[in-house]
Amino acid sequence: MTDSSPQSNPNAVPGAADVPAAAEGQQQQEQRRGRGDRDGRRGDRRGGRRGQERDSEWQERVVQIRRVSKTVKGGKKMSFRAIVVVGNEKGQVGVGVGKAGDVIGAVRKGVADGKKHLVKVPLTRHNSIPTLSNGRDGAASVLIRPAAPGTGVIAGGSIRTVLELAGIKNVLAKRLGSKTPLNNARAAMVALSLLRTHKETAKERGISLEQIYS
């Protein structure tokens, strides 16, 4: 007498009814986790691009790198000092100083310091300054005055770097006193910080805007 009951096949693939419910729940969690990881990576890429766009607005130029020393109990400690000018060529500029044991670290610190000391510069339609201004820092003095369209930036050294990164295209500048790059750059920053638009000047003097132009 033959047995008609089906024999079990060890190589047979289990069907959906044979898979426990707990295993199905685990598979669903893994699928959700995979989608979440992909979405997170996609979001990180978007955030990185936005950060790069913000950083690309700023330009930095190294004015000077010097090797300096500090006398300590054990002898002399050598380091580097970098003077960096940071600007977006849209009316914002800053001068920073950074010190570190290597040049790259000093420049990086100088850029961060420059972004902490930004000055907003009022620009005219022709990318010049509205009025004459004079700034001092230590023994350095800088005089800047507006110029006609097509004149360009008539300045030299660190003063020219500050004016160009501020977005000024037509200006005349005169250096008086010390020739130190850091003092001249800071004196130019003081002169730019003292600038006022014609509207602000009229409000401070208590007169109309027409009287300013007359």
Swiss-Prot record:
One of its GO terms (cellular component) is small ribosomal subunit. The keyword Ribonucleoprotein applies. The keyword Protease does not apply. Disulfide bonds: none annotated. One of its GO terms (biological process) is translation. It comes from the Bacteria. InterPro entries: Ribosomal_Su5_D2-typ_SF, Ribosomal_uS5, Ribosomal_uS5_bac-type, Ribosomal_uS5_C, Ribosomal_uS5_N, Ribosomal_uS5_N_CS, Ribsml_uS5_D2-typ_fold_subgr. Residues 58-121 form the S5 DRBM domain. Residues 30-60 have a biased composition (Basic and acidic residues). Residues 9-29 have a biased composition (Low complexity). GO terms for molecular function: rRNA binding; structural constituent of ribosome. With S4 and S12 plays an important role in translational accuracy. Belongs to the universal ribosomal protein uS5 family. Part of the 30S ribosomal subunit. Contacts proteins S4 and S8. The N-terminal domain interacts with the head of the 30S subunit; the C-terminal domain interacts with the body and contacts protein S4. The interaction surface between S4 and S5 is involved in control of translational fidelity. This is Small ribosomal subunit protein uS5. The gene is rpsE.
